[in-house]
Amino acid sequence: MPRMVFRSAALAAVLLLGGQPARSVSAQETPELAPYIMLRSLQFVQDTVALGDHSAGEMQRFMLNKIDSALRAADTSTFDDPRNVDAALIYAMSGGNPATLEYLVERDLSGNFDSRVADALRKYLGGKGTLVAKSLGDMAMEYRDQAIGPYVALVSGNVTDPENPVGALEYYDIARLGAPGTIIEEAALRRSVAIAVDADLVDKGLAYSRKYARRFVHSPYASQFVDFFVQLVVEHHPELSEPDIDATVEFMDVERRREVFLRIARRATLDGKNDLARMASGKAAALAGMAADGPEVLARLYRGVASIPTSEVGTAIEDLAAIPADELSPRDQALRAAAQAIASEVIRKPTTESLAQDAGVKVEARPDAEIEEASPGYEDPGPAVVALPASLESSVEIDPEIQTFVESGRSKLSEIDDLLKQEGVVR
């Protein structure tokens, strides 16, 4: 990691010097670099971050501050060069200070800045982008083959998404195709996956996912992509088959593939998709090896939970009981407790009393089961906790997904008892 920091800093320094090797010069001899040259350093650093060098974040902040100072200090004649105008606009769309763009536009007496673009960006950066969505869309088409084109297209996609998500995909496609291998493509692909998943565009979602996994799996934003991909797989299985999943995760290293399969197994388990849960947990266990480390233990947990509604319930109960509690996170301990409670009801002989009562399944919930980290790399974007019904003696809070799992199991048990009663098995 230190080597990556040095490499990013060194290459950025070379770019700051206009591509010339660094040499000792006095402050008086240091030339003032044009904004467009400085912007190249920022773009390089940001692209390095997107490709997996998380250590370049500090250099990115340094470059933003450096460019901000240079733009404010620049003579108005500097912007007679269209490349410097583009640099100022791209800087503003790359996390720069919006007030600096405002300052430059106010001083522009020569009409170097396209007032339409400047006004639209000021509204966008001021949180009013939806008011200029159509204008930005038109400008994305107009500037698509120019330096600012991919940036304007990305912004257009962002402001179009709330009202017309599928329409935003067109702008994201323009952005990523105009800036391949950059942070622009990373952002456009990631947001395209999210839109495709929410809109049930399975084929597009899978295609975008494979492109992202191939290029940006080491991005600091990749965990968001994994969230979307897991949702896509679980919601559309078996339409999305095992080969479809494998063709996407094959671009990932072993550790990330294992993480993805664990997250698929967990969500599939809680959603009652037991075939998918067993498949994913089996793949995660195979990737983890035979050592009883965290990932292998989690794979056993999810495989056991997924086996409860099957004829292998007895084996599942034994497997769940054999998992050491200290190797599970508090949330996964709560999941195991819920699964064991449901499993015990599955194998319990129904009685007349059980048909008459309406008591809830007793789950020993843990007060610390609201910890966010449920498994390696797992991120739950929803509410962390939800209250148990008042009928439970221990009125604490547990994971809402586990609450749903318990209620689903309780409902299935009730249906089974009703069928037995109708058939006269229970009197």
Model-predicted segments: where are they?
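Alpha-helical repeat scaffolds
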Residues: 62-70, 97-107, 129-142, 165-177, ...
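Alpha-solenoid helical-repeat scaffolds
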Residues: 51-56, 69-179
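Residue-level signature for tetratricopeptide repeat
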Residues: 122-123, 157-159, 191-196, 215, ...
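N-terminal leader/linker segments that initiate helical-solenoid repeat arrays
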Residues: 15, 24-114, 328, 344-427
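Solenoidal tandem-repeat scaffolds enriched in leucines and small polar residues
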Residues: 168-238
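Generic helix N-cap/helix-start motif at coil->alpha-helix transitions
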Residues: 40-43, 75-84, 108-118, 145-153, ...
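Structural motif corresponding to the intra-repeat A-B loop/turn of tetratricopeptide repeats
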Residues: 94-95, 125-128, 161-163, 199, ...
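Long, repeat-rich segments with strong aromatic
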Residues: 250-315, 322
